[in-house]
Swiss-Prot record:
Pfam families reported for this sequence: Aldedh
Metal-binding found in the keyword field: yes
Needed co-factor(s): K(+)
Catalyzed chemical reaction(s): betaine aldehyde + NAD(+) + H2O = glycine betaine + NADH + 2 H(+)
Source superkingdom: Bacteria
The protein's Enzyme Commission number: 1.2.1.8
Subunit structure, interactors included: Dimer of dimers.
Disulfide pattern: none
Annotated K(+) 1 binding sites: S26, I27, D93, V180
Cofactor note: Binds 2 potassium ions per subunit.
Underlying gene: betB
Family: Belongs to the aldehyde dehydrogenase family.
Pathway this chain belongs to: Amine and polyamine biosynthesis; betaine biosynthesis via choline pathway; betaine from betaine aldehyde: step 1/1
Protein name (Swiss-Prot/TrEMBL): Betaine aldehyde dehydrogenase
Amino acid sequence: MARFELQKLYIDGGYVDASNTETFDSINPANGEVLAKIQRASKEDVERAVVAAEKGQKIWAAMTAVERSRILRRAVDILRERNDELAALETLDTGKAISETRYVDIVTGADVLEYYAGLVPAIEGEQIPLRDSSFVYTRREPLGVVAGIGAWNYPIQIALWKSAPALAAGNAMIFKPSEVTSLTTLKLAEIYTEAGVPNGVFNVLTGSGREVGTWITEHPRIEKVSFTGGTDTGKKVMASASSSSLKEVTMELGGKSPLIVFDDADLDRAADIAMMANFYSSGQVCTNGTRVFVPNALKGEFEAKILERVKRIRPGNPEDENINFGPLVSFEHMESVLGYIAKGKEQGARLLCGGDRLTGGVFDKGAFVAATVFTDCTDEMTIVREEIFGPVMSILGYDTEDEVVRRANDTDFGLAAGIVTRDLNRAHRVIHLLEAGICWINAWGESAAQMPVGGYKQSGVGRENGISSLAQYTRIKSVQIELGDYASVF
């Protein structure tokens, strides 16, 4: 029997039954428990949500900027009041340690919503003089009904990253969470309604990306789709969105990011950064720096420091405050990660630690994989080329700066990159050469609300967060006014 009651769709300000009887299970990856039965939206439900969103958006957009800002700030307050409750639910649904979800997931999502709530009154046009008798003014108008499609690793944070700028700009949103982790997004919908967001402005449709996601991206009255997920799926979403009605798209896709340790680096700091860039959230972070480049002369010393730090990982029941390493998000994903680890062994990478499923005691019922470190890796290995999205670090040796920059850029991805060095001249020089949209110097992973994030190459289109993202949820209307005589050629 499921722990929670049947989870319904959220349309037009409240829970409604799907138009069919199909459901799917939400599974706790720490122990295989069925958390809830969740209704699967139909194509008819997508249309219902669009109609509700169109109605609600007109009311929302007609409010003053200050009114919208106040309502969104109230949603921020409710999120913070319910932080621990939401974090506990996120931990059950994703398997992420409560020590993460309590202090990061809801907190950073609320920070982004607060940031955009403060920017609402700053949405403004401009006045452009043409001559004494004529000028142009511009209006930034909301797109209308937009859609967000989330990934499974940061469910509520991603829903907030997408909905915050969309709602701040006066749009209504239809959001489809990942089928794997749907529960906290439904709670977010409740919070928006409680805060005073008009009915229909934020709707949640649960179900598979193959069905519900496709119906959303193909819908002719949805003006924009913001998607977070894998590159292959992103390409399909983009093709569907453009072929149906030339929708605008924002894509935050996969990565295989390089972390470069230079010969002057503080190796203890470098090892700390590498650990966070590979094993935080059990390695399930799109920006992870999984290709760790280390000077050949320092590789042995660096490996020893990594092994020392791996001993500090505390895997186990993610509801335990002392645990800092939970299971992977699902048993299916666990098998995928184990498959990549097997390829690493087969292709000649030297295994420093891990490399297996964790078993015994609490681990037997969960999707746990040991923190895994390979070294002596080469650029053509599968574990170096493809995104694994799990706790697998690949250490690669190098000799020169030119060599490591070339190899770091030798990838189809371009989401993130980082370097560790004491030489700031080198730091900025190399960062300017790296083909990645998010870069860190002597750090890794922080993405403040003010910081635009997104990728180069096949890692994405557009940006999330920052002022630029707010503009992407508006369109410009140009208006010319003539105060003087109008001359006709006829």
